[in-house]
Amino acid sequence: MVKVAVTGALGRMGSGIIKTITETDGLDVVAAIDIPNHPKKGQDVGELTGLGKIGVALSTSDELEAVLKESGAEVLVDFTAAAPCVQTAKTASKLGVNLVIGTTGFTPEQRAEMEDAISKNKVAATISQNYAVGVNIFFKTLELLAQKLGDYDIEILEMHHKFKKDAPSGTALRAAEIIQNNLNRDSNVIYGREGITGERTKEEICIHALRGGDIVGDHSVIFTTEGERLELSHRVTSRQSLVSGAVLAIKFVAQKKEGIYNTFDVLDLN
């Protein structure tokens, strides 16, 4: 039985992960953590998420180290925000706890700080902008399209709910990174357009971010040239697709001793 701690326990992703873990053989929720001074601290997290009692009280992140030690957690799952996630990763890795990180919006410095702690403490971690299985097939397909349609104009469009904190999405940034890594030409990423921009340059890969309503996550990459257009799209209609992928990552990382992995590793797409 793999003992799992979940941060952001009452958030959209955290509560879904807790529910799915309780329904999954071989996994056990042993700690649920949310923001400091949370008014529901101490209450059973199962009751707070509509599952009924599961015997795990809601803890807060200011007591993370003590909670991880007491619970004996082997894997910690984090879908929160960039700054607290870095601190969580540093604390967990110091205690030898493996990590599944789905938080996005890291600066390069934050990402480096987090990865340094993971490597220094010799734990295993999966870090991904999107754990949905389908979106990772989308990423894999992008590799081929960028190689074969590299002389086309390329635009990326992403849409998310109005509450999303970062833009563009981590998934859109990852798509741009994959495209750049597979093009046989120079390229540069720009973000939206405004004013008199002049003629589009061949090097541009432009990311457009839309926000509104309750859109879980839509991503499209558009390849255009004279006479034709090819669009590759992925739409998340329920966060369960992300949750299910994260649970696969928990099982994967629980078997690893150290190293930093991504969802291509989890799904054997490399």
Swiss-Prot record:
The active site is at 160 (proton donor/acceptor), 164 (proton donor). GO terms for biological process: diaminopimelate biosynthetic process; lysine biosynthetic process via diaminopimelate. NAD(+) binds at residues 8-13, 34, 102-104, 128-131. It holds the Pfam family DapB_C. It comes from the Archaea. Belongs to the DapB family. This is 4-hydroxy-tetrahydrodipicolinate reductase.
